[in-house]
Amino acid sequence: MGKTTTIGSVELERYVQSAFRLQSGDTVVYVDPHRLDGGPPAALILITHEHFDHMDPNAIAAVATDDTVIVANAACARQLQGKVKGRVVSVQEGDTVTEKGVEVRAVAGYNGHHPRGFNVGFVFRLGDQMVFHAGDTDRVPEMSQFGEIDVALLPIGGTYTMAEAEAAEAVRMIRPRVVIPMHYGYATGGDPEKFASLVGPDATVVIL
């Protein structure tokens, strides 16, 4: 079990690394599920890229049903097709799909460890919240073009992603109401309290 918070009509639960469950009403969305052994059945699973701590077939199997839709980039989709329950939908940066009543837009997310196209972020509306999950990325210029974001889920761990200071600069580009740090304290460092102090009044930081 992870730590939970509720923002508007959406309950968010953060597990390890960048793994989240988001639920509004009966619609359950997981993003990058990792090291899960169960949970509410998924309507939708979003996978940002194929690294083991983001695309975990065992965790997907723990929450997927035959009715689940899995949205992932092409490399992940190829690996998952026919190996997990549910229907797999392949996307690339710039694509928008609507599945299970949720409109999902694949957006830019990249750095030296994750070349452009290897990782995608996801912007999606669930309930009354517009959510952005960055996957593994640094601050990139495209972030200023994502439109209105209520809740941003941003990596802060450094090494493979942006660290606290760069993530705080990303907050100023994205302009979310709420930001939840992720991708820290597992395979990398990262201090969520330091990140919160750097964000200051620019957004409400919720640490899970």
Enumerate the language-model features and the residues they cover:
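Cap/insert and terminal regions of metallo-dependent hydrolase folds
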Residues: 69-72, 139-208
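Short glycine/proline-enriched coil/turn segments at helix->beta-strand junctions
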Residues: 25, 40-43, 65-67, 82-86, ...
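Redox-cofactor binding/interface segments in oxidoreductases and associated redox assembly factors
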Residues: 46-47, 105-107, 154, 181
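Short glycine-/acidic-enriched loop or helix-start segments at secondary-structure transitions
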Residues: 32, 40-41, 56-58, 80-82, ...
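Core dinuclear metal-dependent hydrolase active-site scaffold
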Residues: 1-40, 90-147, 162, 208
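Active-site regions of enzymes building and remodeling cell-envelope glycoconjugates
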Residues: 42-49, 83-93, 103, 202-205
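Short, acidic/turn-prone active-site loops that include or flank metal/cofactor-
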Residues: 35-36, 51-52, 75-77, 93-96, ...
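Active-site metal-binding motif and surrounding structural segment of the metallo-beta-lactamase
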Residues: 33-79, 148-153
